A protein has these predicted regions:
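Class I S-adenosyl-L-methionine-dependent methyltransferase catalytic core
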Residues: 1-228
Length: 228
């Protein structure tokens, strides 16, 4: 697969690469520190470049999914969108080109399309048929040469047939912080004890698909119960 040109090509057909801030950044795209600064100019420049491709990851999700949860009391009314730069870094740093990414909590289209653009195979599972259909449409519109695979179903069951993973990469629900559906199988619709039990079982199944000497990455946000 030819090198992906996030910033396009120059007049001579060469891939445009913004000047790196140093040799470490040149090798790793952005400096691989323990704490990543998503507000930095370099990060924001890459994010704008990715988003200019036309991502609409909220399509297929329930409108105002944050408003269905307790987070509404915080004034957070919009559906969250996954940062494509976070996907790019995780995929580049922790998986080989041509490798298989397995995502048991797929949600929107961003992780699948970015992984595909970077030369990885992608398998993701989501409970909602509407979400899977929307992801497939976006993938065809944004990067028709990329072929992420989205499966509609419960990861508790579908992971048995998932491919062996070079990288398990996902963004699970954060308790009841964001509600995705009223499906009783949806972790975001469960009470805390049921959520934790199902969460552990799905992650155990996902980790069981990993090849030797590979990595797993789960992106989570800050979450506290009503008692803080």
């Amino acid at each position: 697969m030819s090198e992906f040109a996030l910033h396009g090509h120059d007049l001579f057909g060469e891939v445009v690469k913004p000047k790196a801030s140093g040799p470490v950044a040149e090798r790793f795209t952005l400096p691989p520190f323990t704490i990543l600064d998503a507000r930095s100019g370099e990060w924001q420049e890459r994010k704008r470049a990715w988003l200019s491709m036309g991502f609409r990851s909220e399509v297929g999700r329930l409108e105002n999914s944050l408003g269905m949860s307790d987070a509404a009391s915080l004034g957070e009314k919009d559906t969250s969108i996954f940062d494509p730069v976070a996907v790019e870094l995780a995929v580049r740093w922790f998986s080989p080109v041509g490798g298989q990414v397995v995502d048991p909590f797929a949600g929107g289209s961003v992780r699948g399309i970015v992984a595909g653009c970077l030369g990885r195979q992608y398998w993701g599972c989501d409970l909602r048929a509407e979400q899977v259909a929307a992801n497939e449409v976006q993938s065809e519109d944004i990067a028709p040469a990329v072929r992420p695979v989205w499966i509609c179903g419960d990861s508790m069951e579908t992971l048995a047939d998932a491919p062996a993973a070079d990288f398990v990469f996902s963004c699970p629900p954060y308790g009841d912080l964001e509600r995705y559906s009223d499906d009783p199988r949806d972790l975001s619709a469960m009470d805390w004890h049921a959520f934790v039990a199902a969460y552990k079982r799905i992650i155990l199944r996902a980790v069981g698909k990993m090849k030797p000497d590979t990595f797993a990455c789960f992106v989570v946000g800050d979450f506290r119960d009503g008692k803080g």
